[in-house]
Amino acid sequence: KGKGYQVQVMETYSSDKSQPDLITHVNVEAAHESDAQALLPALEDVEARELSPTELLADSLYGGDENVEKARKHGVEVISPTMGEQSHAISLADFHYSESDELLSCPLGQTPQRTKTGKNGGKIVHFDKATCDLCPRQSDCPVKRVKQSATISYDAKALRLARRRSQEKTAAFREAYRYRAGIEGTMSDLVRLMGIKHLRVRGMTQVRVAATLKATGLNILRSAAFRIRKRRRYAGDHPDDSAICAIMWSVKERFFHLLSCFRQLSGELCLYSCRPDAFTAQLA
């Protein structure tokens, strides 16, 4: 009961598993906040700590055109599906353009009669209506045929979205985006292992601290598991060294156990015989 919260999480990923996947950003928001507003603060946070990624995989709520363009200014490529669906079988991305994105021809090769600039800076391209009327793909085409003209309008944003939708159909996009599913496993670990849904604190500040500590704990578990896997792989690749490694590990563990006992005994003796000076010694 009470005010609801949601946690935004960013983590690293490596396709070759040469490094553990670790959480690099945690932020707690009110439950009604939109995910679209969480991307840029997250990028600014990791950039300030020199942890900026080169690519960021996110779902469509984070991958709006404005977020993608602003992330590019931070040197980050956002890989995300676009919102909405393509309305025609032929899209803006199927037309041919110059390097400055001036429309040169339709997919079947018809060139525009003229191009005008609209009120908001977009382009209004006019084609020959008679030619469009004879086109075998007119039902699939976004060009609008009205009275004496056949026109199509677009701006930079519409063209970017069309190109992104076209890119989403490629094998390269599917291969890159499949790693995004890893964050779902992370959220599951935070819930099952760390109990992030059942915090014993209230208030935004306390919840943020608790969520950050939970994420830190998960990072420690992952780092330890990664180190154990790495050690086991090494033992499998070097069977002659496995016995030596086991002995060295046992000696190391025993040494640190004895050192811990010695420190505890020294502390007890110090507190017993030198208690008035203990605080001063700690400060020094």
State what each model feature region is.
Residues K1-A284:
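Anion-binding and metal-coordination hotspots
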